[in-house]
Amino acid sequence: MKARGFKTKMRGFKIFSGSAHPAFGKEVSKHLGFPLSKAVIGKFSDGEINIQISESVRGKDIFIIQPTCVPVNDNLMELLVMVDALRRSSANSITAVLPYFGYARQDRKAAPRVPITAKMVANLMQEVGIERIITMDLHAGQIQGFFDVPVDNLYGSIVFRDYIRSKALKNPIIASPDVGGVTRARYFANQMGLDLIIVDKRREKANESEVMNIIGSAKERDVILVDDMIDTAGTICKAALALKEQGATSVMALGTHAVLSGNAIKRIKESALDEVVVTNSIPLVQKCDKITTLSVASLFAEVIRRIYHNESVQSLFT
């Protein structure tokens, strides 16, 4: 996908990038056809974030690219401080472009006396002056309802779809790595015109190991596991092993957000997975031969262009 440049109509537009993923910001700006605007991002001696906008933004429509990935708290705070600086500099509007939305997993009260942190983060973003959110594959779709401003939740499946078709797999089938991800996997299966199977993880009794039940048949199939994020990689690695034991020819995992915490890379290297495909929504620090990274920068660039020109975003995915 290639964003149509709009240099002739960019007088009221500026795009900034935080320090969370500068390479992504540069790639988006390249697709749009003009450079990032400048800001000095630093820290005081005690670790407090200090930001100075280096050019006039008075009356401009601002887009800030900043995934709230590791270190989550620093990157979130940097975003909020930058928004405050821009608002106090008389920006006309401020849109936060969050390829990865951190704190999305705490979207409900799953136990007594716990926070709903996703809602709290939404409140913070709105209170500081963010007027629109562009993000991708939210962990829970209902997070869009935590905001009282427009939220464009993009689908990473648009790049995965093209990649899978280029592989020319002989007997592909889509799989959800757990019951909770069925809706997401079904959506992708429908897009691809493929069947769906489910890996059902159960613990029959306390202190017993988990049993991986597969709903459907993976025998002699090229299985494509679909998830929104890969964190510790435990779930997809266990699912891949169960699928191979049932006779799957190959197992590939698609995960929009490569969080890859702890020993995730080691698990993937030693797993039954043949390939793991992720996007560059988060900077990939560690390398692994099994991991393929697809860029979504052109997708975000085109969405930014469409929003700036008041064009439909949904038509990209239909």
Swiss-Prot record:
Active site, renumbered: K201
Instruction: Please give the chief subcellular localization of this protein.
Output: cytoplasm
Residues where ATP binds: D46, G47, E48, R105, Q106
Annotated binding of Mg(2+) 2, by residue: D178
Cofactor(s) needed, names only, are: Mg(2+)
The domain of life for this entry's organism is Bacteria
What are the binding positions for Mg(2+) 1 in this chain? Answer: H139
Co-factor binding details: Binds 2 Mg(2+) ions per subunit.
Record organism: Helicobacter pylori (strain J99 / ATCC 700824) (Campylobacter pylori J99)
Q: How does it assemble?
A: Homohexamer.
The identity of this protein, by name, is: Ribose-phosphate pyrophosphokinase
**Metal-binding listed as a keyword:** yes
Q: Is-annotated flag, keyword Repressor?
A: no
Q: Where in the cell is it found?
A: Cytoplasm
**Gene Ontology MF, one:** ATP binding
Note one Pfam family from the annotation: Pribosyl_synth
Keywords noted in UniProt? ATP-binding, Cytoplasm, Kinase, Magnesium, Metal-binding, Nucleotide biosynthesis, Nucleotide-binding, Transferase
Which pathway does this polypeptide act in?
Metabolic intermediate biosynthesis; 5-phospho-alpha-D-ribose 1-diphosphate biosynthesis; 5-phospho-alpha-D-ribose 1-diphosphate from D-ribose 5-phosphate (route I): step 1/1
Q: Report the EC code(s) recorded for this entry.
A: 2.7.6.1
The GO cellular component terms are: cytoplasm; ribose phosphate diphosphokinase complex
Instruction: Tell me, in a sentence or two, what this protein's role is.
Output: Involved in the biosynthesis of the central metabolite phospho-alpha-D-ribosyl-1-pyrophosphate (PRPP) via the transfer of pyrophosphoryl group from ATP to 1-hydroxyl of ribose-5-phosphate (Rib-5-P).
* Family classification: Belongs to the ribose-phosphate pyrophosphokinase family. Class I subfamily.
Q: Which reaction does it catalyse?
A: D-ribose 5-phosphate + ATP = 5-phospho-alpha-D-ribose 1-diphosphate + AMP + H(+)
